[in-house]
Regions:
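Alpha-helix N-cap/helix-start motif
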Residues: 60-61, 145
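ATP/NTP-dependent adenylation/nucleotidyl-transfer catalytic domains that generate, transfer
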Residues: 4-24, 38-41, 46-49, 56, ...
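Conserved G/P- and acidic residue-centered "switch" motifs that form tight phosphate/ATP-binding loops
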Residues: 29
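Active-site glycine-rich loop that binds ribose-phosphate moieties when present
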Residues: 116-119
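Short, surface-exposed alpha-helical segments at coil->helix boundaries
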Residues: 33-36, 61-65
Length: 251
């Protein structure tokens, strides 16, 4: 594991230009905590900037503060609540007289994905304040496999240190880094509906990681089917945007 950590640290150093900083959202969850810790090892705490982005009130924001304090990194707090509400309201206004549409405020796709996209926009705005800086993607391979992220939201970024690692592997890294157990093993949730990520997915990360690792005998049939279905339905999130190619003119 130490070899992997050393390689991650070396790789991160190649992703941020000299004099630049790594900018990442600090949610207080395992992924952002571990990604931030790796960036600190690679670049020094003075070159890592945390951004706390509550949507109105964030119940566990104290964990975000603890991460920044633990790592000794500078941070900014940008509350996205008013922006999310204002944009949703503007969209809603365009559909007030269209009876076939529900209110934008009640649209689950908007409620789930808009805050994630506003957060990524915020990260790039903060990064723009620091010359030559890069935004860190904090998604992991397990969530990516079943599309448990927002396209152009938390799925975006300039480089992804955890993107090829499963949750199981990331937890091992967090423990090896000596990070507090309650941060590394904190039950992940979306912070909106009160449910855990595993509740939303309908299976555990243990089962998902067993599937990804090819240990199919450990995965119940119904869970196997859910994972396959989600993977097929969300592949568009991780493929390059389809582009019309001029050679088709000659078909």
């Amino acid at each position: 594991m130490q070899n992997r950590i050393d390689n991650l640290v070396k790789w991160i150093r190649t992703q941020v230009p000299e004099g630049g900083k790594a900018v990442l959202g600090i949610s207080g969850g395992k992924d952002s905590t571990i990604a931030a810790a790796l960036c600190v090892r690679a670049l020094g705490k003075e070159n890592v900037i945390g951004v706390l982005m509550p949507d109105g009130i964030q119940a566990d924001i104290d964990d975000s503060f603890r991460v920044c304090s633990l790592l000794g990194i500078d941070y900014h707090i940008v509350n996205i609540g008013n922006v999310c509400y204002a944009l949703t309201q503007e969209v809603d206004t365009n559909f007030l007289n269209r009876w076939e549409f529900k209110s934008a405020h009640d649209n689950p796709m908007i409620k789930t994905n808009l805050p994630a996209r506003i957060r990524m926009t915020t990260l790039y705005a903060v990064a723009a304040m620091y010359p030559n800086s890069r935004v860190v993607n904090t998604c992991n391979a397990s969530e990516d496999y079943v599309g448990y992220s927002t396209k152009y939201g938390d799925a975006a970024g300039d480089f992804s240190p955890l993107g090829d690692l499963t949750v199981r592997e990331i937890l091992t890294i967090g423990d090896a880094l000596g990070l507090p157990h309650y941060l590394v093993h904190k039950t992940p949730s979306d912070g909106m509906c009160g449910k855990t990520d595993e509740d939303n997915l309908g299976f555990t990360y243990e089962q998902l990681d067993d599937f990804i690792e090819g240990q199919y005998d450990k995965v119940p049939d119904d869970v196997f089917a859910k994972i396959v279905t989600l993977h097929k339905a969300t592949r568009h999130k991780y493929r390059p945007i389809p582009t019309y190619e001029r050679w088709r003119d000659n078909i």
